[in-house]
């Protein structure tokens, strides 16, 4: 036995309790010559081979029957490239020794990762197929600073943690190892002897692909090529652009009718993408596609932030879907969940035996509502992990926007907590200062690194400046969901029309704060689940009135300032709540033309008309783009306003939220002339009563509502009409 190798070291190495395998294994200089040591469980014979000649240059002696081999090459003093000829169960294999390769991570990468400023940590951490010194294999690295030992286990080593213990880079807490022969498509995990001496098997936080539930292994996968956004895609996200978002849960938009199984990414590219384009939407928003173990979370409890879920196919299949959307002129928004993660043992929870990614105190690190864990945003490496993930989706897949979920739960320490269940910040306040700084930093980096890409916030409180710059105290988002508008308008619409006159302010209140943020008007998935009913089913009255109310509401929404968002199924007035385990009710559109077809045609026309007329979208966030013409007619539940573009062109929007037609309804206007009815939600085309104004109306020089000229209209029952000035 080598005098340099202590029996206790060999025992610890074989038992998986040794933290520095490179100090023992591989090739080492000794006084007697070069010494090669290898841990090869179940091997019976090991030779050192010189690759250039194929010549055997020395045999390794088995010093421990459990698989520790050692041998001196007496005539060799300088390190050289070598291979090992290993006999297992009577068969000889030629392998490259992982322990002959030097450190993998560059010093700059190690420094940036430790500092938490590595913009693209996924390029260094995780698993990356590579060639080193002419040998093909895979580089593995994982951050686990408090672990006593970390090994790579996988299909290439029989999931045996003894075979590939990793090197610790103490300056960064990162463990690394190059494994020759490991290749794309193979499964792997990290086996950790944690800070408390317990064995943990963890999936790779940076894995680009993972197994589909219930399996939990990571998969070696190539890093996708960078995607350069086109000028058209960048313009489509701007504040003056028409933005109409079709929100989709990929697993339940449509399913195979024979077995209720999901459509694949490629099938969705062939079916969903052309449908959304035909309907006139400008953006697709996807509920989270990150890998997640529980279908019922809809993806909002992710365990693989860097891995598109395998439910619908591979990473390349997902890229195919995104490319198809872009080719169809659709921008893609991804729901992103940096607010919390599930406590599954294979994932991030107590990753190295300590609360590495989460806060240790449950008053800071545990979500009572969702039984999930909260990221420790104050820890640089954790924040870096999340910021890098944002760039990953945008740069490597061409995602055009991220919609950040549950922002309020991130920025308030007392979110959904009673007194005594939360810890104030350093100033005694309720704000989570670390989360606020994380969001500001993420938005800043997106703006700097991915021109044209944007972020959207689902923020349910009145936190000031969500879409304002950080230097003025804001969070730096581009857009914010207007949940207040959504709640107020739905509360109004569910009322019997006879009572709406007493709640007129629910439709007008939104304009009092409309210009405080850059708003998206969302009718999202959250509004059609958990007993809330479908949007259609919330409307009052008989079937005719329900559909008429819904059409009038959509006409109001598409004209109101703010970008639009509609969850799948609402575009054809699905009658039941959304069920993530089943397809949408496409059968409602089968057979003869019906009310559902009418709503679908209306939404299509709303989208195309909205996109065509700048007055409906160009000045969403400018006071000049909106003006009330009739705001106080609560007795008749009539509201009329003007939308305006930069050139001063106007579109008049008039809504009657009662079932009583309003004939000879006169109101003052700004621009006299001939006005054409460009949309009427009561049209027979949409299965309405076809009450209207014959297509064109002329203004009168009759004073009304403080204006010299006026229009005299028929306002259809439970309807919204749009009029465009087309001449004197």
UniProtKB/Swiss-Prot annotation:
InterPro entries: A-amylase/branching_C (IPR006048), Branching_enzy (IPR037439), GlgB (IPR006407), GlgB_N (IPR054169), GlgB_N_E_set_prok (IPR044143), Glyco_hydro_13_cat_dom (IPR006047), Glyco_hydro_13_N (IPR004193), Glyco_hydro_b (IPR013780). The active site is at 405 (nucleophile), 458 (proton donor). It catalyses: Transfers a segment of a (1->4)-alpha-D-glucan chain to a primary hydroxy group in a similar glucan chain. Coiled coil: none annotated. Pathway: Glycan biosynthesis; glycogen biosynthesis. Its EC number is 2.4.1.18. Gene3D superfamilies: Glycosidases, Golgi alpha-mannosidase II, Immunoglobulins. Signal peptide: none annotated. Keywords: Carbohydrate metabolism, Glycogen biosynthesis, Glycogen metabolism, Glycosyltransferase, Transferase. GO terms for molecular function: 1,4-alpha-glucan branching enzyme activity; cation binding; hydrolase activity, hydrolyzing O-glycosyl compounds. The keyword Repressor does not apply. Belongs to the glycosyl hydrolase 13 family. GlgB subfamily. Monomer. This is 1,4-alpha-glucan branching enzyme GlgB. It comes from Salmonella paratyphi A (strain ATCC 9150 / SARB42). The lineage of its organism: Bacteria, Pseudomonadati, Pseudomonadota, Gammaproteobacteria, Enterobacterales.
């Amino acid at each position: 036995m080598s005098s340099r190798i202590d029996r206790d070291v060999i025992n610890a190495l074989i038992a998986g309790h040794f933290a520095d395998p490179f100090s023992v294994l591989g090739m080492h200089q000794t006084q007697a010559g070069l010494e090669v040591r290898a841990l090869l469980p179940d091997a019976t014979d090991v030779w050192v081979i010189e690759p250039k000649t194929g010549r055997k240059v020395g045999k390794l002696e088995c010093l421990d029957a459990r698989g520790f081999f050692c041998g001196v090459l007496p005539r060799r003093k300088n390190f050289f490239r070598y291979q090992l000829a290993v006999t297992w169960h009577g068969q000889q294999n030629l392998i490259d020794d992982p322990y002959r390769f030097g450190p993998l991570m560059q010093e700059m990468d190690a420094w940036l990762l430790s500092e938490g400023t590595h913009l693209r940590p996924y390029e260094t951490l995780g698993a990356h197929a590579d060639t080193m010194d002419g040998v093909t294999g895979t580089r593995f690295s994982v951050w686990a600073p408090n672990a006593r030992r970390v090994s790579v286990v996988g299909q290439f080593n029989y999931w045996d943690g003894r075979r590939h213990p990793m090197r610790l880079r103490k300056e960064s807490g990162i463990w690394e190892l190059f494994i020759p022969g490991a290749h794309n498509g193979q499964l792997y995990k990290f086996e950790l002897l944690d800070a408390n001496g317990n064995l943990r098997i963890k999936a790779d936080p940076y894995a680009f692909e993972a197994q589909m539930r219930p399996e939990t292994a990571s998969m070696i996968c190539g890093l996708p090529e960078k995607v350069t956004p086109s000028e058209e895609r960048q313009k489509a996200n701007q504040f003056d652009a028409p933005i109409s978002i079709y929100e989709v849960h990929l697993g339940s938009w449509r399913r195979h009718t024979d077995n209720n199984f999901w459509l694949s990414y490629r099938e969705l590219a062939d079916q969903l993408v052309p449908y959304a384009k035909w309907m006139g939407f400008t953006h697709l928003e996807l509920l989270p596609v990150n890998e997640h173990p529980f279908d019922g979370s809809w993806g909002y409890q992710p365990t693989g932030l860097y891995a598109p879920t395998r439910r619908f196919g591979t990473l390349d299949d997902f890229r195919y879907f995104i490319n198809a959307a872009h080719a169809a002129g659709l921008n893609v928004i991804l729901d992103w969940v940096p607010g919390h993660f599930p406590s599954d043992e294979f994932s991030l929870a107590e990753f190295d035996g300590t609360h590495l990614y989460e806060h240790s105190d449950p008053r800071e690190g545990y979500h009572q509502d969702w039984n999930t864990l909260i990221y420790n945003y104050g820890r640089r490496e954790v924040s870096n992990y999340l910021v890098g993930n944002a760039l990953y989706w945008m740069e490597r897949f061409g995602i055009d926007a991220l919609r950040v979920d549950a922002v309020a739960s991130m920025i308030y320490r007392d979110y959904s907590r009673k007194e005594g269940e939360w810890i104030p910040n350093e100033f005694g306040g309720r704000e989570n200062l670390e989360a606020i700084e994380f969001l500001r930093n993420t938005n800043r980096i997106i703006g700097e690194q991915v021109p044209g890409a944007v972020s959207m916030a689902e923020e349910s409180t009145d936190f000031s400046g969500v879409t304002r710059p950080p230097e003025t105290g804001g969070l730096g988002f581009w857009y914010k969901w207007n949940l207040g508008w959504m709640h107020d308008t739905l509360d109004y619409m569910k009322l019997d029309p006879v009572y709406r006159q007493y709640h007129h302010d629910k439709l007008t209140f939104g304009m009092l704060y409309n210009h405080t943020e850059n708003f998206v008007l969302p009718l999202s998935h959250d509004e059609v689940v958990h007993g809330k009913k479908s949007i259609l089913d919330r409307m009052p009255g008989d079937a005719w009135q329900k559909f008429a109310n819904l059409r009038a509401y959509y006409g109001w929404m598409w004209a109101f300032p703010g970008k639009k968002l509609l969850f799948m199924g609402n575009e054809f007035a699905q009658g039941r709540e959304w069920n993530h385990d089943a397809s949408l009710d496409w059968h409602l559109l089968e057979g003869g033309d019906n009310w559902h077809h009418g709503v679908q045609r209306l939404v299509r026309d709303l989208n195309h008309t909205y996109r065509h007329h700048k007055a409906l979208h160009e000045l969403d966030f400018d006071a000049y783009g909106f003006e009330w013409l009739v705001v106080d007619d609560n007795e008749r539940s009539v509201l009329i306003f003007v939308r305006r573009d930069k050139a001063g062109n106007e579109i008049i929007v008039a809504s009657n939220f009662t079932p009583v037609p309003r004939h000879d309804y006169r109101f003052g206007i700004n621009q006299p002339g001939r006005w054409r009815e460009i949309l009427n939600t009561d049209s027979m085309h949409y299965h309405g009563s076809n009450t209207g104004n014959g297509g064109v109306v002329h203004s009168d020089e009759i004073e009304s509502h403080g204006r010299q000229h006026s229009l005299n209209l028929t306002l259809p029952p439970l309807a919204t009409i749009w009029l465009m000035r087309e001449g004197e």
